[in-house]
Amino acid sequence: MRKRIKPAVLLVFFIGIISFLVLSRTIADLQARERQETTKTIPNPNTPRKTTTASSSSKKEEDINPELVGRPIIDISGWQLPSEIDYDVLSQNVGGVIVRVHSGAQAKKENAATYLNGLDKSFKTHIQEFQKRNIPVAVYAYVAAKDKKEMEKEAEEFYKAASPYKPTYYWLDVEEKTMKDMNAGVEAFRAKLQALGAKNIGIYIGTYFMEEHSISTDKFTALWIPTYGFDDGYYNAAPDTNTEYDLHQYTSQGQLNGFSHYLDLNQIAPTQDQEAIYRKLFKVQKDNSS
């Protein structure tokens, strides 16, 4: 006769089998997971490494404000009195400002806009007020010396007065013949300015004057051309020239909120990349290099 197995023994037996299966599955899962983690940590020799390099430009540059790119650019001097300007309002309507610092050696006596030494009476206020409102500022000097030595002296005075404000560009305003070889005089001014430390130097000149007096623009890094069309306060047409230029002064009769009198209005050449040229002329650098 067969011996009966007690139910309690069977229960213990089945519980043991089930526990063994569960434990085996758990161990297998853990081993598989460990193999996966090990595979992840082993670099694939065929996978290119990612390298992180610091951008040199990010150390020096601040990006431009894109809202400013399409706005008019104005050039002003002591003839635009600070007391008549609402800088808060005008700053909302311009993309950049070019401020006269030196009026040239033609000054015979002091006037409302200029000291006898040629320095503009309002340049400091204009620069400071616009810079406080985050409007980029460039500067210009009217070139009117009678020989190369005097040209270099004016360049020194211009740079000494303007450089503390770290302008984005230095412009030479060339409108009249004041010495026999005007091209040599302009180059003497430019070269002296560069030797003093100015890196961005442009020239403002009419195409007719440039051709008539053989003024070379090759060593300048930017060209600013005045042509007014009807001079009615609006942009009429691009300058009639094959010369590549950066900035166009298109009217002397412009009107903008923030100033109740006429202003010179300028725009970036329509044939150029607007943002690229704006960045070239008006980008402020973190290290404020001139």
Q: What is each model feature region?
A:
Residues 1-14, 24-26:
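N-terminal Sec-pathway targeting helices
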Residues 20-41:
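Sec-dependent signal peptide cleavage junction
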Residues 42, 48-87, 221-290:
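Functionally critical loop-and-helix segments that line ligand-binding/catalytic clefts
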Residues 78-88, 113-129, 148-162, 208-212, ...:
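Alpha-helical scaffolding within the catalytic cores
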Residues 147-163, 177-192:
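Alpha-helical scaffold elements lining the catalytic groove of polysaccharide deacetylases
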